[in-house]
């Protein structure tokens, strides 16, 4: 099956950004807009989960490569709180830590070392939009590497999560006979 390539995101800082997501094959490639190429891959033989665009949240079954360099990818399992759906990247190449955390039903915020970089929206189908903060949170501007990480995480895992009360109610109802 060919990867799904959507109309490129029109990023306000970097121009056209392509996200090619293939749920069945477990691959995502982010490119264009002067960004370093980002690839997220699901390990062969891993049964895909339909509610995760890349197919799994198991860190042992995923790899992240940006500009040819393997980075540490740590998606949380996701359960009762929005924060439990966070995805962390520890970047040896950049010497920093990125975190994508849901902050509403449809959006997630990307931070670098605790400083807000921007807010992403993705419905989990490979289409992604970004709204950047002017200073990138820590006084450093948002760079192409930051954008590549953000687009890759948003496209691979989707953005947003239900509020805690609804997640809790759904968990209780799932246990009800």
Where does each model-flagged region fall?
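Low-complexity or membrane-interfacial segments used for flexible interactions
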Residues: 1-29, 103-177
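Extracellular beta-strand scaffolds
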Residues: 95-96
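Surface-exposed, interaction-prone regions used to assemble/regulate multi-protein complexes
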Residues: 77-79
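Low-complexity, polar/charged sequence tracts that form flexible coils or short amphipathic helices
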Residues: 54-56, 81, 100-103
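A glycine-rich, hydrophobic loop/mini-helix early in the fold
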Residues: 33-75
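Short, surface-exposed coil-to-beta transition loops
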Residues: 59, 83-85, 105
């Amino acid at each position: 099956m060919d990867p799904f390539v959507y109309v490129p995101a029109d990023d306000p800082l970097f121009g056209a950004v392509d996200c090619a997501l293939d749920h069945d094959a477990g691959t995502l490639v982010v490119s264009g807009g002067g960004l370093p190429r980002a690839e997220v891959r699901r390990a062969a033989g891993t049964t895909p989960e339909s509610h995760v665009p890349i197919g799994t949240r198991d860190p042992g079954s995923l790899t992240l490569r940006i500009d040819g360099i393997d980075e540490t990818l740590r998606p949380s399992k996701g359960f009762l709180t929005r924060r439990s759906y966070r995805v962390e990247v520890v970047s040896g190449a950049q010497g920093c830590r990125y975190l994508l955390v849901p902050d509403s039903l449809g959006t997630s915020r990307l931070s670098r070392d605790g400083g807000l970089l921007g807010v992403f929206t993705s419905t989990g189908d490979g289409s992604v939009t970004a709204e950047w903060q002017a200073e990138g949170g820590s006084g450093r501007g948002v760079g192409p590497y930051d954008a590549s990480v953000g687009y890759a995480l948003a496209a691979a895992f989707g953005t947003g999560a239900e509020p805690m009360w609804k997640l809790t109610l759904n968990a209780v109802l799932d246990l009800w006979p």
